[in-house]
A protein has these predicted regions:
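Hydrophobic alpha-helical transmembrane segments of multi-pass inner-membrane transport and secretion
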Residues: 13-40, 262-299, 327, 402-427, ...
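Small-residue-rich transmembrane alpha-helices
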Residues: 30, 34, 288, 322-386, ...
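Intracellular coupling helices
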Residues: 4-20, 24, 284-325, 383-393, ...
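Membrane-proximal extracellular/periplasmic loop immediately following the first transmembrane helix
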Residues: 35-98, 199-206, 217-221, 239-249, ...
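Hydrophobic alpha-helical bundles that form the membrane domains of multi-pass transporters
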Residues: 260-341, 345-346, 360
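Alpha-helical transmembrane segments
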Residues: 18, 27-56, 340-347, 413-442, ...
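Mid-to-C-terminal secondary-structure elements
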Residues: 115-127, 139-263, 475-655
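Membrane-helix entry/capping segments
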Residues: 2-4, 9, 13-14, 223-275, ...
Length: 789
C-alpha cells in the first residue's frame, strides 16, 4: 500500500508528463481496440455453426466455373457421399430477389429454403415461437423483418402470401447471432413447400469423427460428365469446403451479394498492420515519456540503492506506476470508444456489441502492457551505478540517444502511415475517376417482373398469363417517352459472369467469359463497335451471333475478324464435324467489375431477346422522378402493388469501392492519430530537454547569440530525427505499396510528391508543437536563469 501511495504521489507531482502520457496511450489503445474488435469479428464469422471447421459444403467446378452446389442434382455419371460417414446433412436454397405479400403490399424478401436439420448445424436465438419447420407452410422470420411487416403486433400465427401463391404461417421469430454470418436472410421457408425451386440447392455435411476428408476430395477431383456426353461433354469436379473457409472465398457467393457476405484477407492484413503500428507508436511514446519523467528521479533511485533497496522493490515501484497509468488510459480509451461508437459502426459497416472478447482484451492489456513498458526502465535503473544516478539527472549521453531513438521509431511509423494514407486516397480517387468504358449516367437496374420462384406452381394457364404480363410490360416500356432503351436480363453489366473454353481456327483452347446480350445492350451502354457490325435481330429471328471484345480477340490470337470464327469446346467434342461460327463484330473493352480486376476476355452471344426479371433501363436526363413514377404505376397495373426494387448504376459502381473507401478512410484517420501521438511524445520530451538547456541558452545569450541562432540550435536536433525517420520510412512504404498492389490491373503511380507532402505535413505539425517552447526559451532572461539554475 505504501508503494502504491508513493507511485500515485509521483504521478501527481509530474502532472504535465502524466497527462501527456495518458492522452497518447489512451488514443493509441482506443484505435487499437477498435481495430482488434473488428479483426476479431472477422475471424469469428459463423461461429454460430456447431463446428465451422468440420461442417462442409459441396464446391463444384464446372469448366472453370466454381460455386456452391450439391451432388444429388447431377443425374449422369453420378457419385454420392457414403451415408455411413455422415452425421448430419441438410440443404439450402438462397432466393435473393424473392417477395411475400401482406395485404396489398408486396414486400421484397431474401428467402432461405431449408429443413429443420439446418438448425442442428447453425444455432440461432429464438425470440418468439418455435425454431422448426414442421409443415410445408411453416416459415421463420428474422426479428428485424417481422418488425418491418407487423410493427409491434405479435407475428406468431400470422399468414403471408408467398410469391408462388401459397400461404405461409409464421411459426417463429429468430434473432441475430452474436457473430457475423456469411448467410443473411429475412425468411426461412420449408423445403417441403415445393419440389421444383428456381435454382439448385447447396448441400451441407457434418461427418463422423475419423472421416477422411482428403480421400473424399481425391474422389471428387476426377472429372465426371454432367449430362450424356453424346450431347453435352461438359464435366465437373467437386471438393469439400468448410463453413469457415466459405466466407473468405467471395467467388463462390458473389452472384448473391445481398444474401452472402464475404471477407478479404488482404484487407484484414492491412488493418492488422495498422493496428500493430498504432499500438507500437503508443507503447514507444509511453516508454519514452515515462523515462523522461524518471530522469527527474535518478538521484532518488541512486540514494535508495545506496541504502539497500533491492531490484524487486524497484521493479514493483515502476510496475505499479505503469499499471496506474495503463489503467487510467484504458478507462479513457473505452470512454472514447463509447463516444465514437456511431461513427465507428458507420466506418466499418458493422454493429459492435459488447462480448467476452472485450473483457479478455482489456484484461490482457492491463496485465501485459505494464510489464512490457516496465522492462526497459527497470533494466536501465537497476543496473546503473548509484554514483552515476546521484551525480546527474539525464545528463548522460546514452539517455539522450535512447530518447531520440524511441522518438525516431515513433516517427518512422508515423511517416509510414501518412504515406500509405496519401497513396490509398490517391488510389481511391483514381478508381472513382477512371471511366469504366461504358455509359453510367441515367441508367437504372430495376426488378420489374415479380413471378413465382417455385416452378411447380406453374400451369399452362399461369405460363400464358405470365407471358401476357411480360408482353404488356415491354409494350408499356416501349411507349414511355422518358425511356430511351431497356434490356431484360438476369444480371446487370456489373454482375460476375461465368465462362467456358472456346477453340480458335487453329484448334487452340481459350477461356472466355460469356455475357448474353441483345443488340440493344451495346446501344444502351454506348459500347463502341470497332470492327464489323452488330445486326438488328427482330423477335422472330431465332439466330444467335457472336460478338467479342478486344481482349477476347487478342486472347484468341486474332488481329481481325475477317474469315475467323470460334466454337465452344464442348460443342466440338460432341460433334467433331461442327464448324466454327463467325465473329460478326468486335467491341471496345470495358471494366465489368472492380477496376483492379482488369478487363476480362468476353464473348457475347447476341440474340433477339433474353428473358429475365431485371431490367436495365436508360432514361432521358432530368426525368428520374418521372420514370420512377411511371414504373410505380406500371407495377400497380400489372401486379396490384406499387412496390419494386431499383438501383442506379452510378450508385452500384460506387458501392463496388466501399472497401477501398474504407481502407483509405482508416489510413487517413489513424495516420492523423499517429501524428497526434508522436507530437504529444515530442512535446513531452521537449518540455524536459529544452528546460534542461536553459543555463546553456542563458550563457549563449550573454555571449551574443541571437534569437535566430537559438531557434536553429534548438530545432536542429528534432529536425535531424524527423529526417532520419523519413529516410527510413520511404523504402518501407514503397515496398508495402508495391507488394499490396502488384496484382492490380489499375493502380495509382507511387510518385515523389506523396513522400514530399507527407514530410512537409509531419514536420509542420510536429515543429509547430515545439514553437511555443522554443520561442519561450529563446526569450528567457539570462540574469534570472543564472540566479536560479
Amino acid at each position: 500500500m505504501k508503494t502504491l501511495k508513493y507511485s500515485w504521489r509521483f504521478l501527481m507531482r509530474s502532472k504535465s508528463y502524466t497527462i501527456i502520457n495518458l492522452l497518447g496511450l489512451a488514443c493509441s489503445l482506443a484505435c487499437s481496440i477498435i481495430l482488434m474488435r473488428y479483426i476479431h469479428r472477422e475471424l469469428t464469422v459463423d461461429t454460430h455453426c456447431i463446428d465451422r471447421e468440420h461442417v462442409y459444403a459441396i464446391c463444384t467446378n464446372t469448366e472453370g466455373n466454381r460455386g456452391l452446389s450439391g451432388l444429388k442434382q447431377y443425374n449422369y455419371d453420378t457419385i454420392s457421399i457414403d451415408n455411413r460417414f455422415v452425421e448430419a446433412m441438410t440443404t439450402y436454397i438462397p432466393l435473393e430477389k424473392d417477395y411475400v405479400i401482406s395485404g396489398t403490399n408486396r414486400i421484397p424478401a431474401r428467402c432461405l429454403v431449408t429443413d429443420s436439420v439446418f438448425f442442428q448445424l447453425f444455432h440461432y436465438p429464438i425470440v418468439q415461437g418455435k425454431l422448426s419447420l414442421t409443415t410445408p407452410q411453416s416459415a421463420l422470420l428474422t426479428e428485424k423483418y417481422a418488425r418491418k411487416i407487423f410493427g409491434n403486433e405479435n407475428p406468431i400465427g400470422k399468414i403471408l402470401r408467398y410469391s408462388n401463391g401459397k400461404d405461409i404461417t409464421v411459426e417463429g421469430i429468430v434473432g441475430e447471432p452474436e457473430c457475423k454470418t456469411t448467410i443473411n436472410f429475412d425468411i426461412i421457408l420449408s423445403s417441403k413447400l415445393s419440389q421444383h425451386w428456381e435454382r439448385m440447392n447447396t448441400e451441407l455435411y457434418r461427418f463422423l469423427p475419423g472421416t477422411d476428408i482428403n480421400a473424399i476430395n481425391k474422389t471428387g477431383s476426377v472429372p465426371r460428365y454432367i449430362n450424356d456426353p453424346e450431347y453435352d461433354t461438359r464435366t465437373h469436379t467437386f471438393s469439400l469446403i468448410s463453413v469457415k473457409d466459405i466466407y473468405w472465398d467471395g467467388s463462390l457467393t458473389d452472384r448473391e451479394p445481398a444474401m452472402f457476405l464475404s471477407g478479404n484477407r488482404s484487407h484484414l492484413i492491412i488493418l492488422s498492420g495498422v493496428c500493430l503500428l498504432l499500438l507500437l507508436t503508443g507503447i514507444l511514446n509511453f516508454i519514452n515519456l515515462y523515462l523522461v519523467a524518471l530522469l527527474r528521479r535518478g538521484k532518488e533511485y541512486g540514494l535508495k540503492k545506496v541504502f539497500g533497496v533491492c531490484g524487486k522493490t524497484l521493479f514493483a515501484n515502476i510496475w505499479i506506476e505503469n499499471t496506474l497509468l495503463v489503467l487510467s488510459a484504458l478507462l479513457v480509451s473505452w470512454l472514447i470508444i463509447e463516444i465514437m461508437s456511431a461513427p465507428t459502426e458507420y466506418l466499418f459497416d458493422t454493429h459492435f456489441s459488447y462480448t467476452a472478447f472485450d473483457g479478455w482484451l482489456s484484461a490482457s492489456i492491463l496485465l501485459l502492457l505494464p510489464v512490457i513498458t516496465s522492462i526497459y526502465p527497470y533494466i536501465k535503473y537497476n543496473y546503473t551505478s548509484p554514483i552515476l544516478s546521484i551525480r546527474s539527472i539525464g545528463a548522460q549521453s546514452h539517455s539522450k540517444h535512447f530518447r531520440m531513438f524511441f522518438l525516431g521509431a515513433q516517427y518512422i511509423i508515423t511517416f509510414l502511415l501518412v504515406v500509405l494514407s496519401l497513396y490509398f486516397n490517391r488510389q481511391l480517387g483514381m478508381l472513382l475517376s477512371t471511366k469504366p468504358g461504358f455509359r453510367t449516367k441515367n441508367i437504372m437496374n430495376v426488378n420489374l417482373v415479380y413471378e413465382s420462384k417455385d416452378f411447380s406452381s406453374y400451369t399452362y394457364e399461369s405460363m400464358q398469363q405470365r407471358r401476357q404480363r411480360v408482353m404488356q410490360l415491354d409494350n408499356e416500356l416501349n411507349a414511355c417517352p422518358f425511356i430511351e432503351l431497356y434490356e431484360p436480363s438476369y444480371e446487370n453489366i456489373l454482375t460476375p459472369t461465368f465462362g467456358t473454353n472456346y477453340l480458335n481456327n487453329k484448334g487452340e483452347k481459350v477461356f472466355l467469359n460469356i455475357h448474353y446480350a441483345t443488340p440493344a445492350f451495346f446501344k444502351l451502354y454506348d459500347i463502341k463497335v470497332i470492327e464489323g457490325e452488330i445486326p438488328d435481330i427482330n423477335k422472330e429471328d431465332r439466330r444467335t451471333v457472336f460478338v467479342v471484345n478486344k481482349a477476347a480477340l487478342k486472347a484468341l490470337g486474332y488481329t481481325s475478324i475477317n474469315g475467323v470464327g470460334v466454337i465452344e469446346e464442348n460443342q466440338k467434342k460432341a460433334n467433331a464435324n461442327a464448324s466454327l461460327q463467325p465473329i460478326v463484330a468486335v467491341v471496345e473493352d470495358y471494366f465489368e467489375g472492380h477496376l483492379t480486376s482488369g478487363i476480362k476476355p468476353t464473348i457475347y452471344p447476341v440474340g433477339a431477346r433474353f428473358s429475365g426479371d431485371l431490367y436495365q433501363i436508360a432514361y432521358t436526363p432530368g426525368k428520374k422522378k418521372e420514370v420512377i413514377d411511371f414504373l410505380r404505376n406500371l407495377e400497380y397495373k400489372l401486379y396490384g402493388s406499387e412496390d419494386f426494387e431499383y438501383t442506379f448504376l452510378e450508385d452500384d459502381i460506387k458501392a463496388m469501392y466501399t472497401q477501398d473507401r474504407q481502407t483509405a478512410t482508416i489510413y487517413s484517420i489513424f495516420a492523423s492519430i499517429a501524428i497526434i501521438i508522436s507530437s504529444l511524445g515530442l512535446l513531452g520530451i521537449s518540455l524536459f530537454d529544452i528546460r534542461q538547456r536553459y543555463r546553456e541558452i542563458a550563457i549563449r545569450k550573454v555571449n551574443g547569440a541571437s534569437a535566430k541562432d537559438l531557434y536553429r540550435l534548438l530545432f536542429r536536433k528534432y529536425i535531424t530525427v524527423l529526417i532520419i525517420a523519413f529516410v527510413i520510412a520511404i523504402p518501407l512504404a514503397y515496398y508495402l505499396i508495391n507488394t499490396y498492389t502488384q496484382d492490380f490491373a489499375v493502380r495509382a503511380p507511387v510518385s515523389i510528391d506523396i513522400f514530399i507532402i507527407s514530410l512537409l505535413l509531419v514536420i509542420i505539425i510536429s515543429l509547430g508543437t515545439l514553437a511555443y517552447q522554443i520561442q519561450k526559451a529563446a526569450h528567457i532572461n539570462p540574469t534570472q536563469i543564472m540566479k536560479t539554475e
